[in-house]
Amino acid sequence: STQGVSSAASDVYKRQTVGQFRRILTGEIKSWKDLNPKSRLGDLSVVFDNPNSGTIHYAIDSICRGEQLASSLTALKSNEEVIEYVSKTPNALGVIGANWIGNKSDTTRLSFNETVRVMAVSNSGHATVGNSHKPYQAYLALREYPLVHDVFILINDPRTALPTGLMRFLTGERGQRIILKSGIVPATQPVRLVNVKDEF
């Protein structure tokens, strides 16, 4: 399965590059003015979902390439807290898994939580409308959204143990549909066979 890391903000700033995001996380960029000269929000307040989350590990290993995160970054207790904090704090930038930022009332998963703005991210040196993508499942699957990582199931129990049954369920059609509906891109897409007649 594939999951994306999203950044959500309440400012009018809509796009960022991976390089800018790295500089925010390492503390080189500290103010919204560094990103958008017209911004009046002052210093960035960057929040993560949990001090031990996979999102923080991904940020250190893959985005910052082993560099330390800035000491000014804060970790809250849950993804819901990050969304609530960002929606109420104008200068906040929240970093959470893309599956948490989806609009739960939209069964198509084509919209995001309306209380925050989800930023589009570009792998290029300059973010434009044409090269920046939001973490929609299609862009995660095609790897056009650059902040993606794979999710694996690792088991070391005997083949007949309970964890093996869970793994088989999750990798089967029903399990992959559950993963799809949770906002994560499944490893295998459910197949639908359609028989089309040439004659009427």
Identify the meaning behind each predicted range.
Residues 1-9, 13:
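Single conserved hydrophobic/aromatic residue that forms the stacking wall/gate
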Residues 10-200:
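Exported/periplasmic ABC-transporter solute-binding proteins
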